[in-house]
Amino acid sequence: MSRREDGRLDDELRPVTITRGFTTHPAGSVLVEFGETRVMCTASVTEGVPRWRKGSGQGWLTAEYAMLPAATHDRSDRESVKGRVGGRTQEISRLVGRSLRACIDLAALGENTIAIDCDVLQADGGTRTAAITGAFVALSDAVTYLGAAGKLSDPRPLSCAIAAVSVGVVDGRVRVDLPYTEDSRAEVDMNVVATDTGTLVEIQGTGEGATFPRSTLDKMLDAAMAACDQLFEIQRAALELPYPGTLPESAEPAKKAFGS
């Protein structure tokens, strides 16, 4: 099998690194790196829920995604300066929120909110999938914090782990984890969000340059699921380390639970 421009095989991920405790203040803070793509993912815990959720006894999880102005080759203005949030930003923010809500029992949170913030420090393709993969680890740390604070009605509110990866058809070949040079010329482009129990959360796929047959879709999903299995192992290894910050003194730190 011939190799890609960066030396990888078609089914090979870029080097993936997950660093917990990247910043001090949030309950969960992670730097996730997929090759040259770097995303800071934080999970902050606040008391209370949105107005439409009050009185339900259930918590909420929301997410925001943004790119720093110099995350790409050409600087872009901050959306706060423009006075509006772009459609792409809204779409990805909602994707991250949906993906993580798929793995957590919101009733176990009580009326507390977990706010996920994903800020792209450097972009080289696959920023949304990197954000989801890193945000799950940040969420896991936030759940550990809530448990130590005695705010969980269920000590294991996470039903599974969540990871995501890009997959596409480039030069007629199915490839996973596309960098920008491949993503920008892919004939088919897809993002897959999966659980460590083998189920799918979301699939976003488009024939960029041409239509594609069902058999290609099946190959892409197989490649993406196999790549996600590797990401789950990386998440698991990161979460085996002790909680990186200071937990509330009222409880003993519990051993980190990974997904299911």
Swiss-Prot record:
It catalyses: tRNA(n+1) + phosphate = tRNA(n) + a ribonucleoside 5'-diphosphate. Phosphorolytic 3'-5' exoribonuclease that plays an important role in tRNA 3'-end maturation. Removes nucleotide residues following the 3'-CCA terminus of tRNAs; can also add nucleotides to the ends of RNA molecules by using nucleoside diphosphates as substrates, but this may not be physiologically important. Probably plays a role in initiation of 16S rRNA degradation (leading to ribosome degradation) during starvation. PROSITE patterns: RIBONUCLEASE_PH. Homohexameric ring arranged as a trimer of dimers. Phosphate binds at R88, G126, T127, R128. GO terms for molecular function: 3'-5'-RNA exonuclease activity; tRNA binding; tRNA nucleotidyltransferase activity. Keywords: Nucleotidyltransferase, RNA-binding, rRNA processing, Transferase, tRNA processing, tRNA-binding. This is Ribonuclease PH. CDD domains: RNase_PH_bact. GO terms for biological process: rRNA catabolic process; rRNA processing; tRNA processing. InterPro entries: ExoRNase_PH_dom1, ExoRNase_PH_dom2, ExoRNase_PH_dom2_sf, PNPase/RNase_PH_dom_sf, Ribosomal_Su5_D2-typ_SF, RNase_PH, RNase_PH_bac-type, RNase_PH_CS. Belongs to the RNase PH family. Its EC number is 2.7.7.56. The gene is rph. The keyword Metal-binding does not apply.
